[in-house]
């Protein structure tokens, strides 16, 4: 099943001759099973093992994972040691450090990640609980270069089964059982309860919902990009062009424009306030968005029939 998933992913996203890929290997069952399948289906596989240094003995775990990768037939296996910061919490900081290390070490190759259907279900449920809109419950994409996820249709139980069949001993990360992490509690408490109450099939349904929303979102994003292009005027957006568009497309177009102009991802509240500059103009002031620099902030405003994004000096703290 895993080989079929990897083969299908390679055929869809990297068509042509059998490609070379990198695999992000933690030593856990998911990434270990992915590595085992990839060495059979891809031309060559380089394993990249990230040691976050967050637990005693993590260096030995990383070295053991690299050794397993070589035994499975990887062309190379490298241990990448990173320093995890504290911004945004431990989970987010570790993820940021991991992706940065993988991005630097991949040598131009696509990097396969071991996210499974179960991970996808957790991601969709977490996004739904946070109420951040359809974009947050699309889940993870099968391929956002250079990151590939061939196992999004595979259950976690299947990766464990393959490891057992191959005589592989995956590492059991203590963090994956720690109730201090939100995702762990979703995995061990919330999803099992939903499966029990609703009679099963919840993980598959959540993953399917995420996939459908991602497909729909891709179409809406393309239409919004066309709208933003039509409204573009020397870095600004023409109000008259935006005003006649459906609200959902207009907000998507404004969001894309903000991101392209250097702003951070805007909140729903910020987007709606900016939308009011287009559709409910009463002379109100601009809307501050994230992405400024020390001493400066980014402000979206309405000026002479256009939406503008300007840097303004921050008011001194009192």
Curated annotation (Swiss-Prot):
Which GO MF terms are attached to this record? ATP binding; tRNA(Ile)-lysidine synthase activity
Q: Which InterPro entries match?
A: Rossmann-like_a/b/a_fold, TilS/TtcA_N, tRNA_Ile_lys_synt, tRNA_Ile_lys_synt_N, tRNA_Ile_lys_synt_subst-bd
Q: Which Gene3D superfamilies does the record match to this protein?
A: 1.20.59.20, HUPs
**One GO term (biological process):** tRNA modification
Provide the binding site for ATP: 26-31
Residues crossing the lipid bilayer are none
**Subcellular localization(s) per the UniProt record:** Cytoplasm
Report the sequence similarity comment from the record.
Belongs to the tRNA(Ile)-lysidine synthase family.
Q: Which HAMAP family match?
A: tRNA_Ile_lys_synt (MF_01161)
Query: Could you tell me what this protein does?
Result: Ligates lysine onto the cytidine present at position 34 of the AUA codon-specific tRNA(Ile) that contains the anticodon CAU, in an ATP-dependent manner. Cytidine is converted to lysidine, thus changing the amino acid specificity of the tRNA from methionine to isoleucine.
Task: Write the protein's name.
Answer: tRNA(Ile)-lysidine synthase
């Amino acid at each position: 099943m895993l080989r079929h998933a990897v083969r299908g992913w390679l055929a869809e996203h990297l068509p042509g001759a059998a490609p070379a890929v990198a695999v992000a290997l933690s030593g856990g069952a998911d990434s270990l099973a992915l590595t085992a399948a990839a060495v059979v289906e891809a031309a060559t596989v380089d394993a990249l093992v990230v040691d976050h240094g967050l637990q005693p003995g993590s260096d030995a775990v990383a070295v053991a994972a690299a050794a397993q990768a070589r035994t499975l037939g990887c062309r190379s296996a490298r241990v990448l040691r990173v320093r995890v910061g504290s911004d945004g919490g431990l989970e987010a900081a570790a993820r940021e450090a991991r992706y940065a290390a993988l991005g630097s070490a991949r040598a131009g190759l696509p990097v396969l990640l071991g996210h499974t259907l179960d991970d996808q279900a957790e991601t969709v449920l977490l996004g739904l609980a946070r109420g951040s809109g359809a974009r947050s419950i699309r889940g993870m994409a099968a391929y956002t270069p250079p990151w590939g996820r061939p196992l999004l249709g595979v259950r976690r139980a299947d990766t464990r089964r393959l490891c057992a069949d191959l005589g592989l001993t995956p590492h059991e990360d203590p963090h994956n059982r720690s109730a201090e992490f939100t995702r762990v509690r979703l995995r061990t408490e919330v999803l099992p309860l939903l499966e029990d109450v609703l009679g099963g099939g919840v993980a598959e349904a959540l993953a399917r919902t995420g996939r459908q929303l991602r497909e729909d979102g891709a179409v809406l994003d393309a239409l919004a990009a066309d709208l933003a292009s039509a409204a573009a005027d020397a870095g600004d957006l023409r109000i008259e062009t935006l005003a006649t568009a459906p609200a959902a497309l207009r907000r998507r177009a404004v969001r894309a424009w903000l991101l392209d102009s250097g702003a951070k991802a805007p909140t729903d509240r910020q987007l709606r306030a900016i939308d009011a500059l287009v559709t409910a103009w009463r002379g109100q002031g601009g809307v501050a968005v994230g992405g400024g620099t020390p001493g400066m902030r980014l402000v979206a405003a309405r000026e002479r029939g256009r939406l503008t994004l300007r840097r303004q000096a921050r008011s001194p703290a009192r």
